Amino acid sequence: ISQKTYDDKPETENKIQDDAQGYGTIDFKNIGSLEYTKPVSLKYFDVEKPEKSWRVLYIDFCTLALADYPADFELMKKECLSGKTAMWLVDERHKGLLRVAKDIGSGFYVEGNRSALDFARNIRRIIDQCKISHEDVIVRYSTRNENAESEHSVSETGKAQERRYHREDKQSFY
């Protein structure tokens, strides 16, 4: 079963809105790479929640959207079960079809074993199906600080430093 992709451009051409502090906001019209990112918050209409993982953010979003748009979720579930789309949304009876079924309420389950990019694409799928304005769903995330990473990778661990000192002592002794 092939999965529809909702990106207009190849992933390499996608752009993510970033600001200088290492934080970004997902542009659901043009989702870019989410590698090395961690969600910070989800804003759904007037509800704003801090988030710590992409999976939990996705489940929170699905739970909120399901409460407001149950008929659309019923339609998306039927599409999944008919084989028109990849299996990502099912009911109680079919939750065994998912690798990691996550309960979102009202007898619905979503696939929880996905990448950050897949979660973002599914959120966009729900936004589009339910005709939610892109401005009403805001996902903020942090990016890995490249400077902090490079400093960390260059610095020695305690054991490595100890071995270096031992070698230097050995060389000066002989």
Regions found by a protein language model. Name each.
Residues 1-13:
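Short, low-complexity, charged amphipathic interaction modules
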Residues 13-174:
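Polyanion-binding interface signature
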